[in-house]
Regions:
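C-terminal effector-binding regulatory domain of bacterial HTH transcription factors
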Residues: 130-139, 149-200
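Hydrophobic residues within well-ordered alpha-helices
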Residues: 22, 72, 117-122, 137
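Short beta-strand->loop
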Residues: 43-46, 139-151
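Central regulatory/effector-binding core of bacterial HTH transcription factors
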Residues: 1-39, 191-195
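Flexible hinge/capping segments at coil-to-helix
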Residues: 40-50, 55-80, 95
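Ligand-binding cleft/hinge of the Venus flytrap
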Residues: 88-102, 136
Length: 200
């Protein structure tokens, strides 16, 4: 649809789980999930999103569900290894308070799909974007662990300053905003966080 509306637009899509240097990599627009943004880039929020803790029923049957943040130390926690984020750290929000939990990773990978696969196989607890695990939760393949805790992880578009007035970047932003709001589980996000989100 984007290319139909803007036939002169040239697109190259790269999918990576690690943050890129926009200038060095010659990237016009980078889609990032998470509120820990580099202050040296220009960012625009595209849509609200959160990450939640979840595990497979087989893991919960074997190990039980954690009863508190401290209890997470007794569990097998799976982490996405990011170059600019400390491995083994979760920043969880509860009742308007942020809690930083530092854990020893049981397994880690720089690929979020691998972490999701390990979790589905019952290897431990992961923190993952709600929109990416919602179907697994509905089907019972994953269970929501410690549902009172979550991490704010909005979806942002990030671009270099030289493209501030770029019509092609604006066209991409407008398209992504409209598409994401229709795709993301806003009602579920509000139910978990007790916040009312402005879609834009």
């Amino acid at each position: 649809q984007l290319l139909e509306n803007h036939p002169k637009l040239k697109l190259q899509l790269n999918t990576l789980d690690t943050r890129q240097n926009l200038l060095r990599s010659n990237i016009d627009l980078d889609i990032r999930v998470g509120n820990d943004l580099d202050p040296n880039v220009i960012a625009r929020r595209l849509a609200p999103s959160i990450r939640i803790l979840c595990a497979a029923p087989t893991y919960i049957e074997r190990k039980g569900a954690p009863a508190s943040l401290v209890d997470l130390h007794n569990h097998q926690c799976l982490f996405i290894k990011e170059t600019d984020y400390p491995l083994g750290t979760w920043k969880l929000e509860n009742r308007n308070k942020e809690h930083t939990v530092k854990l020893r990773p049981h397994l880690s990978s720089n690929n979020s799909e691998i972490i999701k696969l390990w979790t589905l196989q019952g290897h431990g607890i992961m923190m993952h974007s709600l929109w990416d695990v919602l179907d697994y939760l509905k089907q019972g393949e994953l269970l929501h662990v410690m549902p009172d805790y979550w991490e704010r992880a909005d979806i942002f578009g990030v671009y270099p300053a030289r493209l501030t007035q770029s019509s092609k970047v604006k066209a991409c932003f407008d398209y992504l905003e409209e598409e994401l709001v229709g795709m993301l589980p806003l009602e579920e996000i509000e139910a978990i966080t007790q916040y009312s989100y402005d879609p834009y």
